[in-house]
Amino acid sequence: MQVSVETTQGLGRRVTITVAADSIEKAVKSELVKAAKNVRIDGFRKGHVPMNIVEQRYGASVRQDVLGDLMQRNFVDAIIKEKINPAGAPNYVPGEYKQGEDFTYSVEFEVYPEVELKDLESIEVEKPVVEVNDADVDTMLETLRKQQATWKETDAAATAEDRATLDFTGSIDGEEFEGGKATDFVLAMGQGRMIPGFEEGVIGHKAGEEFTIDVNFPEDYHAENLKGKSAKFAIVLKKVEVRELPELTEEFIKRFGVADGSLAGLRAEVRKNMERELKGAVRNRVKTQAIDGLVSANNIDVPTALVDGEIDVLRRQAAQRFGGNEKQAAELPRELFEEQAKRRVVVGLLLGEVISQHELKADEDRVKALIEEMASAYEDPQEVIEFYSKNKELMNNMRNVALEEQAVETLLAKAKVTEKPTTFSELMNQTTAA
């Protein structure tokens, strides 16, 4: 077997392999002998068909199978010998085959990039320093009450805390535009769902009033024909409702799993959940900065095959979120996922090199702690822990999470880490925005 390797472009490689004719004929003869044992041809007993007849009848197909097998096996031998690490499936390009002659073919593929980590000391990370205080718990209790609130119709003017039911018709230069009209539209005020100026124009009006408001569509508005345009909305305000918050009664508190129904018990449960969320938010904030710094400091090429694989994964995930199927997933535009897919590949390669260089292995104590932390959010944590322990795939996924955390900690040991005091609400708002 003769082997030559050439670089086509970037990470692209072409391996050209020549297989000696005698190796091919030897393999073909061996396969024909095996086939002859089971061949049934009229006039001959099973296993006693002359080899020349077996070759005449089956030689072409056996030869084709042998060539396919030799191409794969010799390629594997070649990349092992040449110490090449292919990324993605190879493309076999067979040459012309003539019986009794050497056979030459080529294989085209991409390789993994050679990653040399650098400038890890230049990575800068701000670690949020924050605690859950009583005021944070009070705010969360108020949020819980709002989530359980009921609505009561009022004759008073609408405020930023109310809910309004209205009809509206939008127009630009006196002409109605597509998507600018609705009937019995329910608007929860203060959530920023509408374009700037719309809610403000409703506030102060009472049910039964008809009025017009002037607004400007933002320059970055999603509809091209409306970007930056001035518009008028004719509004009929049909109903205004005020939010009625439930009292923190024993019955209300028990809805949240606090058995004794006490306010102290609810506050303790809320604080525990907030601290768990806070721990995760701090961890993710630090991790994101560390990985961003790693990516910025290490510009590497990525194999197209790996990016394509990630795009397929992201397509399927997107389709599943919206109830789509495999066919619909494949039809989603590549451009929607390409940037995210490329970043995932880059991050995977760089963290993989961190793990390899430092010979990291998943810490089983950390794996156990991660499962326990995740399980604590459920009604029966022990049941969740046992479910994970019996599921090999879930355990491997959690080991990967632990290993990634260990890789990030390795980065942080070299990075410039400074502590930044902040508040619970600021951190959680940043997390939501991200």
Curated annotation (Swiss-Prot):
InterPro entries found in the cross-reference section: PPIase_dom_sf (IPR046357), PPIase_FKBP_dom (IPR001179), Trig_fac (IPR005215), Trigger_fac_C (IPR008880), Trigger_fac_C_sf (IPR037041), Trigger_fac_ribosome-bd_bac (IPR008881), Trigger_fac_ribosome-bd_sf (IPR036611), Trigger_fact/SurA_dom_sf (IPR027304)
Enzyme Commission (EC) number: 5.2.1.8
GO molecular function terms attached to this record: peptidyl-prolyl cis-trans isomerase activity; protein folding chaperone; ribosome binding
Example of a GO cellular component annotation carried by this entry: cytoplasm
Keyword field: Cell cycle, Cell division, Chaperone, Cytoplasm, Isomerase, Rotamase
HAMAP family for the chain: Trigger_factor_Tig (MF_00303)
Protein name: Trigger factor
Biological source species: Yersinia pestis
